[in-house]
UniProtKB/Swiss-Prot annotation:
CDD domains listed in its UniProt record: iPGM
UniProtKB keywords: Glycolysis, Isomerase, Manganese, Metal-binding
Protein name: 2,3-bisphosphoglycerate-independent phosphoglycerate mutase
MF term (GO), any: manganese ion binding
Record organism: Clostridioides difficile (strain 630)
Length: 510
């Protein structure tokens, strides 16, 4: 008997916004999604703030979204967990952080990370807490290596953050900026080692662009037409010498909490086996605020991983179901590692399909990305009649939305519409069913209605939730859902009991 697959199609960064201006989704031609919405029940679900375990009003992101979707419960995110520990005071007695501070008394403390309150990869409040702790512990030499954002924040907001941290350091009485690098270099995740090398050279070798202050470095970049994301790695100088390069035995605290864009620069700084580029042979006391990758050695983890039992993937495997996880490079970790609750190993019966993302500087240059190739390969896999459950992510609305180009984002959305149409036709033909949704908003909110400025960050808008399949044509959906209700809905569609760890609910009205 042919399998009747249940598919979960995640249109990354595809939110709902009633305003049309600056809304690449509303401005796109989406005949397939329009038709599907007419034929099948659909609603909106929440994908930000408290609904996904983030602080109230905090925009969602892909890591958080996929973790909540796969877990079937609200997962309290590292941002919330760490911020709470600062408020409670536990942060300042954290064993690993204390050890780093003790080591730095004889040496120096380098604090590196994304200078942002975007809350996606890091939070500026965590940096301030580390500086305060250093002062309280008697550390004299504290150097900040700032990575500038411009993706999860306004494209030219780095000066504000730099001033805020400078004011904080002045008030606390310790700390100075040593280097500044755009996240494009310091936080690459696509093995573009030549980018990472520039950030490494600035921090360790004191080689790169030069400036007398972080403000000067940022302003030079703006004058050169480069926004925060693309600030060239720059060494801050004092008396013709770098303010503070990383030296043997220094302590380093990397205050990013999201792993994917923290891994490469960490590997460059700590791994003995490394072939990305030539490095200095130095050993340091290196702290990752959270676990970036279990395979990275020579690091200390300040906030270890939370374990999630019975995620959707694990539970389906226990029930003997086969599954396919499909995405292009940019979102591959999201449909595997994050969807599985931070577990790298595939479940029994879980196959993975990775399509390389195109090698372009920014995705507005190729808004189709690898969606067509991904769709063709996924259609082949559907034809194999071997999968009970399929998760597929289209990266386009998010990755192109981040570029700020509405024109390119429209192409991205229209590409996804075409691809979703093909997949749904095939799934329905097989007698299967599907949920079409998103992990967070982005492409629907690309202009600030008040200032008219380009927005490159995610949004706090709800996302679509469409249930497709012959037996659901006249079904009713519950309102007020959230991402953690998706897994229980899928189990409902697969006629499986929900495990007790899942606190979400099926959104199909009984």
């Amino acid at each position: 008997m042919m399998k009747k697959p249940v598919a979960l199609i995640i249109m990354d960064g595809f939110g709902y916004n009633k305003d049309v201006k600056g809304n690449a989704i509303a401005e796109s031609k989406t005949p397939n999604l329009d038709r599907i919405k007419k034929e099948y029940p659909n609603t909106l679900i929440n994908a930000s703030g408290l609904d996904v375990g983030l602080p109230d009003g905090q925009m969602g992101n892909s890591e958080v979204g996929h973790t909540n979707i796969g877990a079937g419960r609200i997962v309290y995110q590292d941002l919330t967990r760490i911020t709470k520990s600062i408020k409670d005071g536990d942060f300042f007695t954290n064993k690993v952080l204390c050890e780093a501070m003790d080591n730095a008394k004889e040496n120096s403390l380098h604090v590196m990370g994304l200078l942002s309150d975007g809350g996606v990869h890091s939070h500026i409040d965590h940096l301030k807490a580390i500086i305060k702790m250093a002062k309280d512990k008697g550390v004299q030499k504290v150097y900040v290596h700032a990575f500038t954002d411009g993706r999860d924040t306004d494209p030219q907001s780095a000066l504000e953050y730099a001033k805020e941290v400078q004011a904080s350091m002045d008030e606390i009485g310790v700390g100075e900026f040593a280097t500044v690098s755009g996240r494009y270099y310091a936080m690459d995740r696509d093995k573009r080692w030549e980018r990472v090398e520039l950030a490494y050279n600035a921090m360790v070798r004191g080689i790169g662009e030069k400036a007398n202050s972080i403000e000067e470095a940022i302003q030079n970049s703006y004058d050169d037409g480069k926004n925060d994301e693309f600030i060239m790695p720059t060494v801050i100088m004092k008396d013709d010498k770098p303010v503070g390069s990383i030296k043997e035995n220094d302590s380093i605290i990397f205050f990013n909490f999201r792993p994917d864009r923290a891994r490469q620069i960490t590997r460059a700084l700590v791994c003995e086996e490394f072939d990305g580029f030539k490095r200095e042979d130095i050993k340091n006391f290196f702290v990752c605020l959270t676990e970036y990758d279990i395979t990275i050695e020579n690091v200390h983890i300040a906030f270890g991983p939370q374990s999630l039992a019975n995620t959707l993937g694990e539970y389906l495997a226990k029930n003997g179901k086969t599954q396919l996880r499909a995405a292009e490079t940019e979102k591959y970790a999201h449909v595997t590692f994050f969807f599985n609750g931070g577990v790298e190993e595939p479940n029994k019966g879980e196959e993975r399909l990775l399509i390389p993302s195109p090698k372009v500087a920014t995705y507005d240059l190729k808004p189709e990305m690898s969606a067509y190739e991904l769709t063709d390969k996924a259609l082949d896999k559907l034809g194999e009649d071997k999968f009970d459950f399929i998760v597929l992510n289209f990266a386009n609305p998010d990755m192109v939305g981040h570029t700020g180009s509405i024109e390119a984002a429209i192409k991205a959305v229209e590409t996804v519409d075409t691809c979703v149409g093909k997949l749904i036709d095939k799934i329905v033909e097989l007698g299967g069913s599907a949920i079409i949704t998103a992990d967070h908003g982005n492409a629907e909110y690309m202009l600030d209605p008040e200032t008219g400025k380009t927005v490159t960050a995610h949004s706090i808008n709800p996302v679509p939730f469409i249930v497709v399949g012959q037996e659901y044509e006249s079904a009713k959906l519950l309102d007020g859902g959230r991402l953690s209700d998706i897994a229980p809905t899928i189990l409902d569609m697969m006629k499986l009991e929900k495990p007790e760890e899942m606190t979400g609910h099926s959104l199909i009205s009984k």
